[in-house]
Amino acid sequence: MAVHRDRDDLWWSGHAWEDYLYWQSNDPKKVDVITRLIEIIRREPWTGLGKPEPLKGSYKGWWSRRIDQEHRLVYRLFDMPRPPGKDTRESITVIQISQCRFHYD
């Protein structure tokens, strides 16, 4: 799976990054909503805006938030060792985005 790293703590799958670029070109207001949801996830991963819900089945471990009635932001969090020389934390929590367009498939 191709991964686009926006920051050390935010990773996009290739599919999710294509979704994001689609919104940049076709509906910039959706980009604003996605950005806001990511900011909220950083503070409150399991509660807050977008009606967060844990997913089941093959998506177990992933969460979904509503971008709007049709589209969902699908994400998960995991800890990993800090990047060398970046800061003093022993680990960082990474948000991995799987998709941000359509309902999870």
Predicted regions and their residues:
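Enriched for short, Lys/Arg-rich terminal
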Residues: 1-9, 22, 28-31, 65-72, ...
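N-terminal first-folded block
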Residues: 11-47
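A short, surface-exposed loop/turn module that caps and links secondary-structure elements
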Residues: 39-66
